Amino acid sequence: MTNFGRVITAMVTPFTPEGEVNYSVAEQLAGHLVEHGSEGLVICGTTGESPTLSWDEEFQLFRTVQQAVAGKAKIIAGTGSNSTHEAIAASQKAAQLGLDGALLVVPYYNKPPQEGLYQHFRAIAQAVPEFPLMLYNIPGRTGQNLLPETIARLAELPNIVAIKEASGNLDQASQIRQLTPTEFAIYSGDDSLTLPLLAVGGVGVVSVASHLVGDQLQQMIRAFTAGQVDVAQTIHTQLLPLFKALFVTTNPIPIKAALQLQGWAVGNLRLPLVSADAATQEMLRSLLQSLNLL
């Protein structure tokens, strides 16, 4: 059984002032995250600005972070694509690098029907039969919802072992849990829904907030699994304003601004994303100060 851990950080991609990938800062940030609660790192996911990275940049990032972490956390490569051929090639290369798994987003823009989604993910799984795969359902970005019945079919494939569920629908998450084996791991794709998702059978979170509060997320999940629901609820309530603030505009704009406020040289974003405006930066500064994060 593959265990990616409870708290997985969807890591930002740092850029230099010239807009090139800053591999040195990526290395430093990865090490910091692992020291502060992250048992896994998703590299080149949504938060990592994958749409504006080249495959060469992505694979260099995979190698850089893999070397920096040195086995202390799972490295999960964002190899999803709306081209099955490209997703297969990227996943095969990630497997050859010795990474711990891949995150595969639902194909976007071309809006395949459920049978097309099933065949897409099955083709990737069959191309890398020994490589653990995590599905990624985020209909707000892809325009298509991966339905529980389709997920259940995919969970029968031995190397499709988990899902990052970011539909925001707890009924759907409950149905996924009902239809899949207990060893199939369900991760929250929304920080604000991590605690509710645990209550319906989730195991953890693929998080943005864990850049800042990874240790606290670990404490919340541990408290819940130990039956200390009131403790978990208190942590959730304390962190909820942060969870909301990090999505006040398009992710990863706020988290990059927050990291810059903490002194991390993560740089700006690549167009068409833009940096946080002054009002957002000031809101984040005030919030981080109130949470003793500055």
UniProtKB/Swiss-Prot annotation:
Primary role: Catalyzes the condensation of (S)-aspartate-beta-semialdehyde [(S)-ASA] and pyruvate to 4-hydroxy-tetrahydrodipicolinate (HTPA).
Highest taxon of source: Bacteria
Catalytic reaction(s) noted: L-aspartate 4-semialdehyde + pyruvate = (2S,4S)-4-hydroxy-2,3,4,5-tetrahydrodipicolinate + H2O + H(+)
HAMAP family: DapA
Site description Part of a proton relay during catalysis, residues in chain: T46, Y109
Species this protein is from: Cyanothece sp. (strain PCC 7425 / ATCC 29141)
Active site: Y136 (proton donor/acceptor), K164 (schiff-base intermediate with substrate)
Annotated GO biological process: diaminopimelate biosynthetic process; lysine biosynthetic process via diaminopimelate
InterPro entries from the UniProt entry: Aldolase_TIM, DapA, DapA-like, Schiff_base-form_aldolases_AS, Schiff_base-form_aldolases_CS
EC category: lyase
Keywords: Amino-acid biosynthesis, Cytoplasm, Diaminopimelate biosynthesis, Lyase, Lysine biosynthesis, Schiff base
Signal sequence residues: none
Protein name: 4-hydroxy-tetrahydrodipicolinate synthase
Pfam families: DHDPS (PF00701)
Listed pathway(s): Amino-acid biosynthesis; L-lysine biosynthesis via DAP pathway; (S)-tetrahydrodipicolinate from L-aspartate: step 3/4
EC number in record: 4.3.3.7
Gene Ontology molecular functions: 4-hydroxy-tetrahydrodipicolinate synthase activity
Subcellular location: Cytoplasm
GO cellular component terms given for this protein: cytosol
Lineage: Bacteria, Bacillati, Cyanobacteriota, Cyanophyceae, Gomontiellales
Subunit and partners: Homotetramer; dimer of dimers.
Lipoprotein is among the record's keywords: no
Chain residues that bind pyruvate: T47, V206
UniProt record similarity statement: Belongs to the DapA family.
